Amino acid sequence: MILCFSILINNNGFSISPAYSSVEQNNISNPFSSTSSFQSKASILDNLPSQNITVGDINIVYKQIGKSDGKPIILITGAGATMDMWNPLLIENLISANYKVIIFENRGVGQSTVGTKEFSINQFANDTLGLLDALKISKADILGWSLGGFIAQQLALLHPEKVNSLILYATSCGGPSDRPTPPEIMQIITNSSMSPQERVQKDIPFLFPPTNWFKAHSDYLNYLPIPKETITQPILLKQLEAATTWKGTCNALSNITQPTLVIVGADDDAAPDSLTLAEKISGSWFIRIGTAGHGLMYQHPEAFNKLVLTFLENSKEP
């Protein structure tokens, strides 16, 4: 059985209503405590020192935020995203709940090196495993966004002993039946004349579809971190090739036994495929948030963060 909810956002907060019938080394306690605005929190996160560690054939650049004895949670970014694209409000909420948050750059992204191994979802999962082992983390909660959700699923299937719970945000089970990248996004990706910052701005209709939320927020850029790190066009294309050639997990999802939250914006292209994840992962939660797209964690941060923390609280090991 899965728990399915649709989240309706209004001026009074958010409410939860059934959407479908049920279907069978930085020891920093709270770096954000003295600031309130989104951009100032993003700036603090940017200014926290990065570290690097050798994992197999690459050096991975990462940041570890929170108490050293906090419960570890790993955040895995999507295609084209750098670790400074995570919403700092999410990270603040997690460390306030006594989590140790690890964010990192995937292979070839930002200051993480490219290495010699083939770009593939399996390899990205093994890179994440290697980071966990290098940091001496025996088990962690895993949050994967978009392509990061592919990596999280593969990690849970290849190394279930390392995964306490899964949060699959704006993603699918991939494979041949997966929806292709929208043509307008591919045009942006293949335009080598744009800077990474320009690409983010061009991605706005994908992150924030033209819904009532978008129309009501002419200041939408204030809801986005400004990326300082970069991803080159060749690396981005390699990420997309890894995603499109991945066989997916659709036929293996019943083997995922960890508590799982599937969360997606109703206006996201990934929304229809996300339900498949929840249907096939036993006992999973499925949350669909209205008036939200691929960037729902920016559009509705309070709802997103509360849902993530509520799920994590319910998924704690005894």
PLM feature segments, named:
Residues 157, 166-194:
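Flexible "cap/lid" loop of the alpha/beta hydrolase fold
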Residues 269-274:
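Conserved alpha/beta-hydrolase "acid-adjacent" motif
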Residues 58-111:
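Conserved HGGG/HGGXW glycine-rich cap/lid loop of the alpha/beta-hydrolase fold
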Residues 256, 262-264:
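Short beta-strand/loop motif that positions the catalytic acidic residue
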Residues 103, 108-143:
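Active-site loop/oxyanion-hole signature of alpha/beta-hydrolase fold enzymes
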Residues 284-318:
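Catalytic active-site module of serine/aspartate enzymes centered on a nucleophile-bearing elbow/loop
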